[in-house]
């Protein structure tokens, strides 16, 4: 990596990276004892790069590309997925998840949440969630609706509506992952996860949904670097240059307005600068922001990392061994901590922070160190949309 002030601090040897990832992916699948790989493709650059790496590592006939549209996000993404499969020579399957989501109540729950803000909402309306501009403080989320006549309206979401909406829409990622693992079980394949470094580091994924995978080949690469790999791998132009989207709501939406607050090129440099301890005034010229705005971005990066710990954490294992005294009538186990009956919490934290969270992100005793920074009971704040905020 370069240094602040250099022309391209995120430059890397693309060909060498492709060769390295190909070899490591092949070894990982072999180590898992799997015969091939399943990749859910959305038509975006991340899944496209992961699919191409899998084909290089395992051969096209041992990679299944899944297209999993639903009624809010469908045709265009699925068509791009088909174009990718044809370019890579890999088999592909399309399964609509609309019926499954209807059966689980995803759309019903989502519509009920929207009607908490727009009581006259109809399913024919399109919608999306947007965040307030980065400020280094409270993040407010609003719902934008578009009526059939083309008129639009935006209203701030109260906390209850926000939580209900996120809980409902997160079902989409979880149902997709269910189908991925169904195919993986059937074929004896590994499931390939597609998050890049920004998504993995900043929590832009759903726990038990798109955050779940057996191998994550590009989770250490900045988005800028993923685009460079897409060019080197020869992906179709429509995929290699496609802007990052959310694939969640029915109105077109970028990750910038939905989650990060900055375009990916700038966000890459902000995360790089935060990890490298680059002072805000030194990074400001490179990212086109004032030093104060860089400090605000650093604050958000730290706060999201605190919240993302939960998303990366393994299950907490409660270990309560019993000694013979507990099984004998009339006898009592020793006191807690005596070694006879105790509870041990084992929750190893696996999130690879390269920079300790700013203490400001830890907030105060009445503001828990999670993704929310509530300003009032009626207004959600810093909890990013793709993951439900903690209680």
Task: Give the location of each predicted region.
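Low-complexity, intrinsically disordered or signal/transmembrane-proximal segments
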Residues: 342, 349-355, 359, 367, ...
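Primarily recognizes the serine-hydrolase "nucleophile elbow" in alpha/beta-hydrolase
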Residues: 56
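ATP/NTP-dependent adenylation/nucleotidyl-transfer catalytic domains that generate, transfer
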Residues: 1-39, 49, 53, 61-64, ...
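Ser/Thr/Pro-rich low-complexity tandem-repeat tracts
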Residues: 355-356, 363-364, 369, 375-376, ...
């Amino acid at each position: 990596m370069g240094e602040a002030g250099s022309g391209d601090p995120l430059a890397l040897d693309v060909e060498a990276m492709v060769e390295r990832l190909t070899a490591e992916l092949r070894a990982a699948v072999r180590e898992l004892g799997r015969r091939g790989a399943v990749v859910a493709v959305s038509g975006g650059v991340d899944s496209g790069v992961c699919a191409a790496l899998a084909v290089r590592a395992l051969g096209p006939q041992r990679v299944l590309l899944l297209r999993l549209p639903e009624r809010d996000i469908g045709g265009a993404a699925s068509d791009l997925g088909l174009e990718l499969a044809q370019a890579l020579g890999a088999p592909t399957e399309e399964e609509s998840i609309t019926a499954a989501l209807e059966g689980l109540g995803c759309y019903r729950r989502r519509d009920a949440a929207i009607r908490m803000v727009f009581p006259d909402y109809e399913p024919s309306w399109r919608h999306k969630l947007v965040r307030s501009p980065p400020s280094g403080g409270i993040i407010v989320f609003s719902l934008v609706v578009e009526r059939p006549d083309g008129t639009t309206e935006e209203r701030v979401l109260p906390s209850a509506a926000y939580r209900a909406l996120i809980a409902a829409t997160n079902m989409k990622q979880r149902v997709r992952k269910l189908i991925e693992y169904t195919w993986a079980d059937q074929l004896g394949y590994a499931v390939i996860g597609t998050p890049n470094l920004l998504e993995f580091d900043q929590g832009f994924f759903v726990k038990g949904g798109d955050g779940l995978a057996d191998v994550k080949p590009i989770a250490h690469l900045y988005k800028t670097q993923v685009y460079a790999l897409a060019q080197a791998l020869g992906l179709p132009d429509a995929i290699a240059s496609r802007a990052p989207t959310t694939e969640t709501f029915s109105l077109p939406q970028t990750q910038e307005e939905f989650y990060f607050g900055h375009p990916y090129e700038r966000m890459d440099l902000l995360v790089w600068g935060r990890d490298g301890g680059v002072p805000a005034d030194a990074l400001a010229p490179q990212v086109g922001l004032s030093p104060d705005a860089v400090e605000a971005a650093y604050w958000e990066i730290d706060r999201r990392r605190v919240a993302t710990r939960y998303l990366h954490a393994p299950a907490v294992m409660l270990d309560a061994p019993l000694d013979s005294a507990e099984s004998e009538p009339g006898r009592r186990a020793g006191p807690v901590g005596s070694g006879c009956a105790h509870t041990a919490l084992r929750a190893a934290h696996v999130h690879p922070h390269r920079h300790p969270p700013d203490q400001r992100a830890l907030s105060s005793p009445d503001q828990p160190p999670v993704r929310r920074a509530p300003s009032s009971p009626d207004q959600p704040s810093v909890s990013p949309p793709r993951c439900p905020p903690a209680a």
